[in-house]
From Swiss-Prot:
Keyword ATP-binding applies: no
Top-level taxon: Eukaryota
Main location: secreted
Molecular functions per Gene Ontology: beta-galactosidase activity; carbohydrate binding
Annotated protein name in UniProt: Beta-galactosidase 15
Domain SUEL-type lectin: 822-907
Active site: E220, E289
Organism listed in the record: Oryza sativa subsp. japonica
Gene Ontology annotations of biological process type: galactose catabolic process; plant-type cell wall modification
Swiss-Prot/TrEMBL keywords: Apoplast, Glycoprotein, Glycosidase, Hydrolase, Secreted, Signal
Length: 919
């Protein structure tokens, strides 16, 4: 389990002081001023208050304001990097490690939404425990020395169920969401006030010594405001004034709100925001959502945004005047239970983020962006010193430079020996061609679609297109199962499901249609959510249809079958006739036409409506609903069609096993379990088995690719929905050319495979052994092929040229605040995950190696000593750094530019696997 990392109190205080001195030096302070400022408002006070809420402050109280250039922390402009991390998409035990990895990656701020439906599941009943313990999360952020950006909303979107709105909200008489509607405004104000009051009570605002420096009201309302006319405008203005009236003492923002009032900072959400400017000169340029990836839908390919393009977008933002940028997401996490949004969004919210769904660093994205953040921080004294616009120099038809300095810079001459603070960004926005540009008395080569950062207006510290970070290959990869579930087995194999799972499975059949005393009958088709109140994905509709002998004879003579049609369904509809599944339809408000086999006499017709995440985006969410719309008709009878819409329908909410809680360890006696036999696959079946936990502390993943669709519980915890829906064969390419504007369909992967096979099981939900796994399976599958794995980087690799930049650690700030670099050779760095060591070097070559990670090969030029030298430096260590130089390896081929390529294997301390238990 993750634990909060911290040195002893005295050492930590010294570290805090050192960090403060570095910050003040970045701001251009003298050494004397830095020491004087050490007792000022920016000092972090450590050890006085932990996450148990004890007395004292995390920081010396400080004010947060802003000017046209930046957010001001304690009166000082800051260039801030923010990391999006939604607390309910991880477990509390994961939070300390995740926050620490955000900080290590260069983040100053943690950003999160506040999820209304998680905190107020029933009207007036509040919940702030477990994954929804917002106060604990905020205190952990502060304990790590980071700031918090709290996006209260309370509309979140976030690909979260119903956009974060509680479903009970739609039942309030006369309510209309997100417009000038009194019932809605009253509930919104009550909840926002609740959150603000709680934050004040816990002393979490900056002026109280807490971490919160920014807040958001509403969310992307400008995208839909036009749908509401003048009522939308009035609502937006009301929301702003309501927020300001809460007297939080820190700035409020509204994203994608070009008409935001003067007192509110309007901000940008997009893949690129370098061209964005707020609606007033008095406001700083803030990027609230930098989409560094994208979400996935069931049956879709997996989005991927290359690290080079993500870095390019961020560098351009700061180059052109940006001051605070937030990665959406830096850690995406998991839509546990039924929190995934709709329509049809998957359980994983990995988002191709720098930290993956399980909390492991995604390399090279995390490392490349960390290097970018370091380079930007080296430029911070220059960036904050410019009050107006930087110097702009046109370097070519598609090349440009922005120069930030404390005085006028003559860009035609060398900056060597110049004492003033100066940093420059050189951009090549050509998508295809390299460019050689002349500035500062020398030539610089710019790859296509890239930015070079020169913290001293002379030396390049970083280029967005040249990756120096390692690449990691995981034991569990998204979209890499050995089985495709397009063709389900018709016979169960009853073979071993892996080294941790029991080979014994038990089954229990789910009742089709009505099963309990809480069912009711009414004429007509009722709207799904009006009946279920979203306490279950499932709603049964059952009626009876009388079929005459004339109908049967008619079908026999024509060689046809009657069909059931429904005008519109969402998300999944299943049709049962006399207890047997006849067919299904999947889609968002699509029509259904299902041929069915009816017999003479009374036939029981049962429809099952299934929700796969409530709509999370758009106008008029309260009207979107679920279930069926329009007419339900039986066609193809001898006397014509029969309209069943207004028939007497019996309604049953949920599954019998679900409401009997047969997934809970203490409720195993509530179902009639029988040992699974080698038999035909049956839909609507519950399965259970026992399993042991993989040794160590690595995250745990379960492969459900052999199953169809359903839900999975571990020790009573609903890990989420699963569905082995296959993505189309087309839409992915074998290689990804990142230059050029990115969108979510560019560089997709996983075509022709199930969108999600692997599912996260948090370790804190597990015991060492005798863990209970329960599945509800709707369509049929083979549970004996389910497997369990520990998730970690099994292979790390890197390739660095001898002409790469010096390591960023060679840079520092002089007392004047000017950036300076010491002469240093490039370095190749490798690092395994926490608790793992480099166990073997599987490839190493200094010379002219070819290929990439997992595909390296030696070239004609190769230093024979490479493998031995790299092995000596790295094996047995968690991380290592090797100078890329002839001084280390000798010169195997004079006059030839050489690279060092290394591939290494990472291993946990112990790879011994627990024997699986039997039930």
């Amino acid at each position: 389990m993750a634990a909060s990392r911290g040195p002893p109190l005295l050492g930590f205080r010294a570290l805090a002081l050192a960090l403060l001195l570095a910050i003040l030096l970045l701001l251009g302070c003298s050494a004397a001023a830095a020491y004087a400022g050490a007792e000022g408002v920016l000092r972090q006070v450590v050890g006085r208050r932990g996450d148990d809420g004890g007395g004292g402050n995390f920081f010396e109280p400080f004010n947060v304001t802003y000017d046209h250039r930046a957010v001001l922390i304690g009166g000082k402009r800051r260039m801030l990097v923010s990391a999006g991390l939604h607390y309910p998409r991880a477990t509390p035990e994961m939070w300390p490690s995740l926050i620490a990895k955000c900080k290590e990656g260069g983040a100053d701020v943690i950003e999160t939404y506040v999820f209304w439906n998680g905190h107020e599941p029933a009207k007036g009943q509040y919940y702030f425990e477990e994954r929804f313990d917002l106060v604990k999360f905020a205190k952990l952020v502060a304990a790590e020395g980071l700031f918090l950006f709290l996006r209260i909303g309370p509309y979140a979107c976030a690909e979260w169920n119903f956009g974060g709105f509680p479903v009970w909200l739609r039942d309030i008489p006369g309510i209309e969401f997100r417009t000038d509607n009194e019932p809605f405004k009253a509930e919104m104000q009550t909840f926002v006030t609740k959150i603000v009051t709680l934050m004040k009570e816990e002393k979490l605002y900056s002026w109280q010594g807490g971490p919160i420096i920014l807040q958001q009201i509403e969310n992307e309302y400008g995208n839909i405001q036009g749908n509401y006319g003048q009522a939308g405008k009035r609502y937006m203005q009301w929301a702003a004034q309501m927020a300001i009236g809460l007297d939080t003492g820190i700035p409020w923002v509204m994203c994608r709100q070009t008409d935001a009032p003067e007192e509110i900072i309007d901000t940008c959400n997009a893949f690129y925001c370098d061209g964005f400017k707020p609606n007033s000169y008095n406001k700083p340029t803030i990027w609230t959502e930098d989409w560094d990836g994208w979400y996935a839908d069931w049956g879709g390919a997996l989005p991927h945004r290359p690290a080079e393009d993500s870095a390019f977008a961020v560098a351009r933002f700061y180059q052109r005047g940006g001051s605070l940028q937030n990665y959406y997401m830096y850690f995406g996490g998991t839509n546990f239970a039924r929190t995934a949004g709709g329509p049809l969004q998957i359980t994983s919210y990995d988002y191709d983020a720098p930290i993956d769904e399980y909390g492991i660093l995604r390399q090279p994205k995390w490392g490349h962006l960390k290097d970018l953040h370091t380079a930007i921080k080296l430029c911070e004294p220059a960036l904050i010193a410019v009050d107006g616009s930087p110097q702009y120099i046109k370097l070519g038809s598609m090349q440009e430079a922005h120069v930030y300095s404390t005085g006028e810079v003559h860009t035609n001459g060398s900056m060597a020996g110049n004492a003033q603070i100066c940093s420059a960004f050189l951009a090549n926005i050509d998508e295809h061609k390299y460019a050689s540009v002349w500035i500062f008395g020398k030539s610089y080569s710019l790859p296509p679609w890239s930015v070079s950062i020169l913290p001293d207006c002379e030396n390049v510290a970083f280029n967005t297109a040249r990756i120096g970070a390692q690449t990691s290959v995981f034991t569990v990869e998204s979209g890499s199962p050995s089985r495709s579930s397009r063709h389900k087995p018709s016979i169960l194999s009853l073979t071993s499901g892996g080294p941790y799972l029991s080979s014994t499975w038990w089954t229990s059949k789910e009742t089709i249609g009505t099963w309990g005393g809480n069912n009711f009958a009414v004429q007509g088709i009722l709207e799904h959510l009006n009946v279920t109140k979203d306490i279950s994905d499932y709603l049964w509709y059952t009626t009876r249809v009388n079929i005459s002998d004339a109908d049967v004879a008619f079908w026999s003579s024509k060689g046809v079958l009657p069909s059931l049609t429904i005008d519109k369904i969402r998300d999944v509809a299943r049709v049962f006739v006399n207890g047997k599944l006849a067919g299904s339809q999947v889609g968002h408000w699509v029509s259904l036409k299902q041929p069915i086999q009816l017999v003479e006499g009374l036939n029981e017709l049962t429809l099952l409506s299934e929700i796969v995440g409530l709509q999370n985006y758009g106008a008029f969410l309260e009207k979107d609903g679920a279930g069926f719309r329009g007419q339900v008709t039986l066609t193809g009878l001898s006397d014509g069609d029969v309209d069943l819409t207004n028939s007497l329908w019996t309604y049953q909410v949920g599954l019998k096993g679900e409401f009997s809680m047969i997934y809970a360890p203490e409720k195993q006696g509530c179902a009639g379990w029988s040992r699974m036999q080698k038999d035909s696959v049956q839909p609507f079946t519950w399965y259970k088995t026992m399993f042991s936990t993989p040794k160590g502390t690595d995250p745990v993943a379960i492969d459900l690719g052999s199953m169809g669709k359903g839900q999975a519980w571990v020790n009573g915890h609903l890990i989420g929905r699963y569905w082995s829906l296959v993505a189309p064969e087309s839409g992915c390419s074998s290689s990804c050319y990142y230059p050029g504007a990115y969108n979510e369909r560019k560089c997709q992967s996983n075509c022709g495979m199930p969108t999600q096979n692997w599912y996260h099981i948090p370790r804190e939900w597990l015991k060492e052994s005798d863990n209970l796994l329960v599945l509800f399976e709707e369509t049929g599958g083979d549970p004996s092929l389910i497997s369990l794995e520990a998730h970690y980087a099994k292979t790390v690799c890197s390739r660095i040229s001898e002409n790469y930049y010096p390591p960023l650690s060679a840079w520092s700030h002089l007392s004047s605040g000017r950036a300076s670099v010491n002469a240093a050779t490039p370095e190749l760095r490798l690092q395994c995950d926490d608790g793992h060591v480099i166990s073997e070097i599987t490839f190493a070559s200094y010379g002219t190696p070819s290929g990439g990670c997992l595909n390296f090969s030696k070239g004609n030029c190769h230093a024979s000593s490479t493998l031995d030298l790299v092995t000596e430096a790295c094996v047995g260590n968690t991380k290592c750094a090797i100078s890329v130089s002839n001084d280390v390896f000798g010169d195997p081929c004079r006059g030839v530019l050489k690279d060092l390529a290394v591939e290494a294997k990472c291993s946990p301390p112990s790879t011994t696997k627990e024997p699986r238990g039997e039930m």
